[in-house]
Amino acid sequence: MIWTSSGGVGLLAACDVVVASEAARFCLSEARLGLVPATIGPYLVRAIGARAVRRYAVTAERFGAAEAHRLGLVHERCAPEALDAAVHAIVEAIAGNGPAAVRGCKRLAGELVGRPLTAELREETARLIADVRGGPEAREGMAAFLEGRAPSWR
């Protein structure tokens, strides 16, 4: 059994992709120590929502990988013996993408949180895709696709 508590859970909440073993257990244990999960709070609320944070922070109860997955803290869960292979597959998938595109996707996801869909936002995102399409990484990626070869970053 693998335990992740307090700041470790907050670290998971800040990660782009989380894979957990079915044997993993989680706990927001700060209240047991007379503390509050203040530093990790913003990440937890974004990952699992305020209602779930309230429950698990005030009770300090332990929960398993299935609940962590249901809450959105964990993206994928697998048998303990399959953990390395599952992580490797995700790392390979990310590594196969354009490095600038990956950075741009991460930045865009962060910038869109909480923003309503307005004309201004539509204009910003249209400008972004136009700028990216004209860049060297996108040109290489599209050429590689059309030529049936791997792009240079792979």
Annotate each PLM feature.
Residues 5-58, 86, 90:
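CoA-thioester-processing core
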Residues 14-15, 71-72, 148:
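Structural motif
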Residues 16-17, 55, 59-61, 67, ...:
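Well-ordered beta-strand positions
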Residues 19-24, 74-123, 136, 152-154:
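C-terminal long alpha-helix characteristic of the crotonase
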Residues 41, 50-53, 84, 101-105, ...:
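A general structural signal for well-ordered alpha-helical segments in protein cores
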Residues 50-55, 63-70, 97-103:
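Short, structured loop/turn "capping" segments at alpha-beta junctions
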Residues 56-57, 68, 108-113, 127-133:
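Helix-loop "lid/cap" segments that line or gate small-molecule binding pockets
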